[in-house]
Swiss-Prot record:
Chain residues that bind S-adenosyl-L-methionine: 70, 95, 122, 145
Gene that produces this protein: trmB
Origin species: Neisseria gonorrhoeae (strain ATCC 700825 / FA 1090)
Name used for this protein in its record: tRNA (guanine-N(7)-)-methyltransferase
PANTHER family: 3-DEOXY-D-MANNO-OCTULOSONIC-ACID TRANSFERASE/TRNA GUANINE-N 7 - -METHYLTRANSFERASE, PENTACOTRIPEPTIDE-REPEAT REGION OF PRORP DOMAIN-CONTAINING PROTEIN
Family (UniProt): Belongs to the class I-like SAM-binding methyltransferase superfamily. TrmB family.
Primary enzyme class: transferase
The protein's Enzyme Commission number: 2.1.1.33
């Protein structure tokens, strides 16, 4: 692989492809009283409101520790556990779904975690407008919606245009860690990441699950049913 400019994209990147990318799909979900209370009482301490201008993450966290972006955290259990396991790393966790946001805030409070900040916004807009180039040491995207039906594959988050937006935000030596339990999506992820000359796979293909990523209940249930899980860890080399 060779070093390339930060805005390097694969040859097949669609021209003008930008605003069609979305990091989420709206769905109906019930907010419990405890989740709403967490948002009401903890947001000022651990929440970050969206702004359309670059943010100083060190100032927002009050530290110069390494910064990891997590896109889509579900109910937040894995996010809280990773932050507990890596106390010398800061995590910016982004999701749009209220119950998950409330639950993660609740877990942050219960576990006395000081190294997570939460955003409730479209991660694509955060990446485009709020994150400074070279501000991230890593990016986690675990179990994004696989959109099983072929006609819906265009809705998948892990596609070349989105990775092209993420790459400039990573420091050289920073990493992207993806995980999925859908084999065909894992193959697509591998193809997409491998198409960037300034990303280097840390494994021959799929990586062993890093120690910091806990097994989720959903993941454990899938394994009992014979389903696989695939992790991919690529490092930025230029």
């Amino acid at each position: 692989m060779t070093d390339t400019p930060e805005n390097q994209t694969p040859n097949d990147l669609p021209a003008g492809h930008s605003r069609s990318i979305r990091s989420f799909v709206l769905r109906q979900s019930h907010m419990t009283a405890a989740q709403q209370r967490a948002i009401d009482t903890l947001w000022d301490s651990f929440g970050i409101d969206y702004q359309a201008t670059p943010a100083d993450l060190d100032a927002r966290f009050g530290s110069s520790r390494p910064k990891i972006l997590e896109i889509g955290f579900g109910m937040g259990m894995a996010s809280a556990e990773i932050a507990r396991r890596l106390p010398e790393t800061d995590f910016l966790a982004i999701d749009v779904h209220g119950p998950g946001v409330g639950n993660l805030l609740k877990l942050i409070n219960e576990n006395h975690l000081e190294n997570i900040r939460v955003m409730r916004h479209d991660a694509v807009e955060v990446v485009e407008n709020m994150l400074q180039d070279g501000s991230l040491d890593g990016i986690h995207i675990f179990f994004p919606d696989p959109w099983h039906k072929k006609r819906h594959h265009k809705r998948r988050l892990i596609q070349a245009p989105f990775i092209a937006k993420l790459l400039p935000k990573l420091k050289t030596g920073g990493y992207i860690h993806l995980a999925t339990d859908w084999e065909e999506y894992a193959q697509q992820m591998l193809e997409v990441l491998s198409s960037f000359d300034n990303l280097q796979n840390t494994a021959a293909d799929y990586a062993p699950t890093p120690d910091y990523r806990p097994e989720t209940k959903f993941e454990a249930r899938g394994k009992r049913l014979g389903h696989g899980v695939w992790d991919l860890v690529f490092k930025r080399i230029g």
